[in-house]
UniProtKB/Swiss-Prot annotation:
Compartment list: Cytoplasm
Catalysed reaction equations from the record: tRNA(Thr) + L-threonine + ATP = L-threonyl-tRNA(Thr) + AMP + diphosphate + H(+)
Similarity comment: Belongs to the class-II aminoacyl-tRNA synthetase family.
Positions bound to Zn(2+): 334, 385, 510
Example GO biological process: threonyl-tRNA aminoacylation
Species assigned in the record: Petrotoga mobilis (strain DSM 10674 / SJ95)
Residue segments, region Catalytic: 242-533
Name under which the protein is recorded: Threonine--tRNA ligase
Keyword Hydrolase attributed: no
PANTHER family on file: THREONINE--TRNA LIGASE, CHLOROPLASTIC_MITOCHONDRIAL 2, THREONINE-TRNA LIGASE
A UniProt-annotated Pfam family: TGS
Function according to Swiss-Prot or TrEMBL: Catalyzes the attachment of threonine to tRNA(Thr) in a two-step reaction: L-threonine is first activated by ATP to form Thr-AMP and then transferred to the acceptor end of tRNA(Thr). Also edits incorrectly charged L-seryl-tRNA(Thr).
TGS domain sequence ranges: 1-61
């Protein structure tokens, strides 16, 4: 007999080999119909998994948070089966088909056919047939020899099988289709009916440009139609907000893939926004006791050997050599900050030292993964390093969390925290890692922050906290990182003198709030759909003279606004007022003033907002004061 412990800690005994499906049926017919998988001793398993020992169990239904990982994985298999049916099993070579955020994909190598979105309708129809057939999904475990025989005509699967160390390999069957997979999967193909194929693209096998280019189909799936509809509407809205379209359109930035791939050019309007972001960041950092520094772009490669970046990061670095000195373009700012620290004698009275830099870094990314401002090769970090005594580190991390909260609240962002622990490829001893991880946990808990743990995803030199912000479309973006580091101070022999003049090792905290200024800029463009709050808007007020005779007075009024620190543009073209209004609305200028006889001869104006609202008879003095306050307070919403 086996003892089964439920989430409410109640215990029930069953015969050896009982399955979660049988347990669900014993509880209620409704639960049996709705269950799709089970969490057994913390691991996701199929409903038909035999339980041979005392275990904890949680039955998973379509409403559970983990459910999308299961049903979208099955949908990837259904799509692969449909593609094989349509184009022929002998012509379709299967690669991989994982679940990703909000969806899934599958990579194919199809002889004699290039997939396009025109193929989607017939693939979707075949998928619907497979779903309607409600084919049972069966997991079988085979040895390596049997797996090789099963997949003898599937070269990509064979490559994966050959690399597996274990001899027991799981294969999932649905009718005449089978795939190499760890699972778990739905009990049958009929459980989830609402899906959509989204796009097709090229993808190198295993992400290596030296390998063959495969064809990747992306899709998504939901248990309810309204959930799918909401997601598809969100995708359409995201396309409208795409920073790669809005950026050039609003004169913010441009990309030159031929001349400088992954290295954005910032245009006049974009530079204004970046300068505002940096000015705000400097103001907040000064408040929290940081000093700003600047470090060189190119430094001797021996620095990167000493820091450990050479061993862990050289494939992502750029190099040059002059006067027989091999140099590296910095991929990170931390070694430079360490050299500044070591430039002077440091006493315990000097600590903590909070060193801050807008540091331009360069990291090689494959051309295939470059993506607007989100994935680039050159970017600016709002990078800081805090050097402190071990007794100060918890308090310093709490202060970084407070600083992060202050900055994100200014942009209206909510965020979640993820604690990432020691990866396999790491520096230093386990005891130091445990001490660092514990300090991060305590800081989060004392800050009353909920967090989840991401095992094995820390940096090579220390555990970290990542903060993911949620934008206006509900999408999550990783921005802030806080990393605790005992390794770099050791490698660089960093010391401070304690109260007894004994040399002690400081702790180093790495942190960036925006993360990358470029990436954060892209997030802001999409979050606000280009309609920045007034304080960030490149042009804050546009004045639109009704005709040429009002141009001079309009310019006089613009100079008054400029003297008050307001960014103004006067559209003195010969175009009609209606055209001028439409043009400024397309530029997403917060406020427009149509300037005619009344505006020239009185102290009142009519204000038009980019949303199309009109506010009449506002005194010029009041307008100026209200806009100044809106800018000073960095309000998210328009005052008028």
């Amino acid at each position: 007999m086996v003892k089964i412990t439920y989430p409410d800690n109640s215990v029930q005994e069953f015969k050896d080999g009982i399955t979660p499906a049988e347990i669900a049926k014993g509880i209620s017919e409704g639960l049996y119909r709705n269950a799709i998988a089970a969490e057994i001793n913390g691991e996701l398993k199929d409903l038909n998994t035999p339980i041979m020992q005392d275990s904890t169990i949680k039955l998973i239904t379509l409403d559970d948070e983990i459910a999308p990982k299961i049903y979208r994985h099955t949908m990837a298999h259904i799509m692969a089966q449909a593609v094989a049916r349509i184009f022929g099993e002998d012509r379709v070579k299967l690669a991989i088909g994982p679940v990703i955020e909000n969806g899934f994909y599958y990579d194919f190598d199809i002889e004699g056919h290039n997939l396009s979105e025109e193929d989607f309708s017939k693939i979707e129809e075949e998928m619907k047939k497979i779903i309607k057939e409600d084919i049972k999904i069966i997991r079988k475990e085979v040895n390596k020899k049997e797996a090789i025989e099963l997949f003898k005509d599937q070269p990509y699967k064979l490559e994966l099988i050959e690399e597996l160390e274990e001899d027991t390999i799981s294969v999932y069957f649905q009718g005449d289709f089978y795939d190499l997979c760890r699972g778990p999967h739905l009990p049958s193909t009929g459980y989830v009916k609402y899906f959509k194929l989204l796009s097709v693209s090229g993808a190198y096998w295993r992400g290596d440009e030296k390998n063959k280019m495969l064809q990747r189909i992306y899709g998504t799936a939901f248990p309810k139609k309204e959930q799918l509809d909401d997601y598809l509407n969100m995708i359409e809205e995201a396309k409208r907000r795409d920073h790669r379209k809005l950026g050039p359109k609003l004169n913010l930035f441009m990309l030159q893939s031929e001349m400088a791939p992954g290295m954005p050019f910032f245009l006049p309007n974009g530079k204004i926004v970046l300068n505002e972001l940096m000015a705000y960041s400097r103001q907040v950092h000064k408040k929290y006791g940081y000093v700003e520094v600047e470090t060189p772009q190119i430094m001797n490669i021996k620095l990167w050997h000493q820091s450990g970046h050479w061993d862990h990061y050289k494939e992502n670095m750029f190099f040059t050599e002059k006067e027989d000195m091999p140099m590296a373009v910095k991929p990170m700012n931390c070694p430079g900050h360490i050299l500044i620290y070591k430039n002077n004698f440091v006493s315990y009275r000097d600590l903590p030292i909070r060193m801050f830099e807008f540091g331009k870094v360069h990291r090689y990314e494959r051309s295939g993964v470059l993506h607007g401002l989100f994935r680039v090769r050159a970017f600016t970090q709002d990078d800081a390093h805090i050097f402190c005594m071990p007794s100060q580190m918890e308090e310093e991390i709490i202060k970084v969390i407070q600083l992060t909260n202050e900055i994100f609240s200014t942009f209206g962002f909510k965020y979640e925290a993820i604690l990432s622990t020691m990866p396999e490829d790491h520096m230093g001893d386990i005891e130091s890692w445990e001490r660092a991880t514990d300090a991060l946990k305590k800081a989060l808990e004392k800050s009353n922050m909920e967090y989840r743990i991401d095992e094995g995803e820390g940096a090579f030199y220390g555990p970290k906290i990542d903060f993911n912000v949620t934008d206006s479309l509900g999408r999550k973006w990783q921005c802030t990182t806080i990393q605790l580091d005992f390794q770099m101070p050791e490698r660089f022999d960093m010391v401070y003198a304690d109260e007894n003049d004994a040399q002690k090792r400081p702790v180093m905290i790495h942190r960036a709030i925006f993360g990358s200024l470029e990436r954060f800029f892209g997030i802001l463009i999409e979050n606000f759909a280009g309609e920045f709050p007034t304080w960030l808007s490149p042009v804050q007020v546009s004045i639109l003279p009704v005709s040429e005779k009002f141009n001079e007075e309009a310019k006089k009024f613009s100079r008054i606004l400029e003297q008050e620190g307001i960014r103004v543009y006067v559209n003195d073209s010969d175009a009609t007022v209606g055209y001028k209004i439409r043009n400024e609305q397309m530029k997403k200028v917060p406020y427009m003033i149509v300037f005619g006889e009344k505006e020239m001869n009185s102290d009142t104006i009519n204000i038009r907002t980019r949303k199309g609202d009109t506010i009449e008879n506002v005194s010029k003095e009041r307008f100026i004061e209200e806009i100044k306050n809106e800018i000073k307070n960095r309000n998210l919403d328009l005052t008028f």
